[in-house]
Amino acid sequence: MTYFVVFLGLCFVLGGLAVASNPSPYYGVVGLVLASVAGCGWLLSLGVSFVSLVLFMVYLGGMLVVFVYSVSLAADPFPEAWGDWGVVGYGMSFIVVLVVGVVVGGFVEGWDFGVVTVDSAGVFFARLDFSGVAMFYSCGVGMFLVAGWGLLLTLFVVLELVRGLSRGAIRAV
């Protein structure tokens, strides 16, 4: 299990690297999906299943809309590739900053790493993410409706902006 968690952490860092050094919006989507899957899998391995599922739906539902919008506005006929020197330079600088942060953080913290799960207080302790689900659905109904309406409005605004002067996604029947 430890190797799997380390693998998920490595995938999360590589996904962040792919988002930070993307040469074009086409490749940013790949890095975002990799980072969100790895991060939510990491949370799932720590025992926070509901929060992991909600974050996964928010990342892939909300952020992919932003990337689709940016891809439609910045559609290059010849986009840069991963192997260009500028992209490799950004990637190497990201890795250098990451290694320096790990080394400095390790010296400051004394290399005291540990994993604490949500239900580490015992058998009779209520899990925090399950007790939060009831509050989320009982007190948050109005916020769900407002957020859903806002997302629907955002979708129509993005579709209207993308279509430009041509007859695009929203047409009068």
Curated annotation (Swiss-Prot):
Annotated EC: 7.1.1.2
Keyword Amino-acid biosynthesis belongs to the record: no
Membrane topology category: Multi-pass membrane protein
Chemical reaction(s) catalysed: a ubiquinone + NADH + 5 H(+)(in) = a ubiquinol + NAD(+) + 4 H(+)(out)
Example of a GO cellular component annotation carried by this entry: mitochondrial membrane
GO MF terms, alphabetically ordered: NADH dehydrogenase (ubiquinone) activity
Compartments, record wording: Mitochondrion membrane
Chief localization: mitochondrion
Family, as annotated: Belongs to the complex I subunit 6 family.
Name of the protein described by the UniProt record: NADH-ubiquinone oxidoreductase chain 6
Species in which this protein is naturally found: Cepphus grylle (Black guillemot)
